[in-house]
Amino acid sequence: MNGGLGRIFKEHPDRRYIMFGGKGGLGKTTFSAAAAYYLAKQGQRVLVFSVDPQASLSDIFQQDIFGKGPVEIMPNLYAQEIDADKRIKAYQGEIRKKIFDMYGFDKIPDEIESYIQAAAAEPAMEESAIFDEVVDIVVAGKYDYYIYDLVPLGHALYYLSMASVYDEWIERITKLREDMRQYEEMAAAISKDKEVEEDMILKELQYIKHRISTSSSILTDRHKTAFFFVVIPEEMILIDTQKAAQLFAKFNVPLSGYVVNRVIPESLASLDIPEYLRNRLQMQKGYLKKIDELFGAEVLARVPEFERDITGLPMIEKMATALFGPIQ
């Protein structure tokens, strides 16, 4: 069963946006790096980027990439860890500039500056900053494949829902702005300069809406996007994954299949091994059977437990081979 993802990628060459989802610590980042390695070896220009504030791509590639934009790891393979703090500071600068441009203030009023500073400390601001950076990355369209190193399941659902929430919010604000303009025009109470300011605000809202729409349409496009759930042969993981799959379906995220990680080789059972390991193998056998019963043909690969951590390109290549088959 190893190497099953290679078949999916060959059968669906238009699926250029790749995501691995699952609970924390199951191997999502490792699989993301391995998929990027495989595709780069096929001559595709690939960007793997983390939307997790506690990103570990730097550790896996053994290279500091945090906050440095796309970093070339090897030919065709680029990796990026988004610096949310840097993005938030850029937000603040953009907000100040827009206030100057739209309202002609000589300086930002103290109460507005206080709000700008306070908003940066909001818990959701980090996720918002990362989301906006992802929109920039995707809209730019510089790569053949984009691989999202997602946060754990709960946060991933929040991230995936942000597009629809933002879209609805922008839609309402834009409608309100348009209504306000109509009332003001009917009252003939605005000057020429004011009309220009109103147009700038509407233009900005429409620009934001277009960016969000572009990103969200990719996430739910069955022809362009592949989403893989990562599971391991353990009871609670299977229960959580079933629940998560139902929730992801509500956001119309196209599920391409399941990948089973950390499978202890059954061949060990014929050796002189400790009793606890023999018990683990017996338990695993039952869970693997249950995985097959639950997910059937959607199980694309069983990845073995490796002898060491997956860090550095040689080990990433081993993982890529387990996922996709021989690397050419």
Task: Write out the residue ranges for each language-model feature.
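Electropositive phosphate-/nucleotide-binding environments in soluble metabolic enzymes
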Residues: 128, 209, 281, 285
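Short, hydrophobic/aromatic alpha-helical segments in well-folded domains
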Residues: 34-35, 133, 214, 244
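Nucleotide-state-sensitive switch-loop elements of NTP-binding domains
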Residues: 1-18, 23-26, 31, 37-202, ...
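C-terminal-of-GTPase-core extension/linker across diverse P-loop GTPases
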Residues: 199-215, 237
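C-terminal lobe/tail of nucleotide-utilizing enzymes
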Residues: 1-12, 214-328
